């Protein structure tokens, strides 16, 4: 996938998630954390000019934090929001995970 296309698709998917999440906010601390995660990654994607390891790490950080909030948090998501998250999840595994380069010691089990 072309650099700009990856950034554009990530931005569109996170924006869609952001739009759908607005309808099911309840004012809980997890809602605030999720909104902060979304705002951070949207800023980073808007600022990014090319795909490099820095933006891939930002995307991975967003994915890990958001996945934890959705999986174990107190968020009450509707079906539309779950679908938007699954779409981003699929994109992340198909386009980001295999491109991300890890440096330093990596321990596999």
Question: What do the PLM-derived regions correspond to, one by one?
Answer:
Residues 1-40, 100-109:
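Short terminal alpha-helical segments
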Residues 21-72:
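Amphipathic alpha-helical interaction modules
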Residues 7-8, 14, 46, 57-60, ...:
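Compositionally biased amphipathic helical and low-complexity segments enriched in hydrophobic
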Residues 64-109:
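Amphipathic alpha-helical binding modules
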Residues 11, 15-18, 35, 39, ...:
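Generic detector of well-ordered alpha-helical segments enriched in charged/polar residues
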Residues 5, 9-10, 44, 48, ...:
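A sequence-composition feature that detects small, non-aromatic residues
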């Amino acid at each position: 996938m072309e650099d700009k296309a990856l950034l554009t698709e990530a931005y569109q998917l996170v924006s869609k998630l952001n739009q759908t999440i607005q309808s099911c906010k309840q004012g809980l601390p997890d809602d605030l954390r999720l909104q902060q995660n979304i705002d951070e990654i949207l800023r980073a994607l808007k600022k990014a000019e090319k795909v490099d390891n820095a933006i891939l790490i930002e995307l991975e950080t967003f994915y890990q934090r958001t996945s934890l909030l959705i999986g174990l948090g107190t968020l009450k998501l509707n079906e539309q929001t779950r679908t938007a998250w699954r779409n981003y999840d699929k994109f992340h595994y198909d386009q980001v995970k295999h491109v991300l380069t890890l440096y330093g010691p990596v321990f596999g089990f």
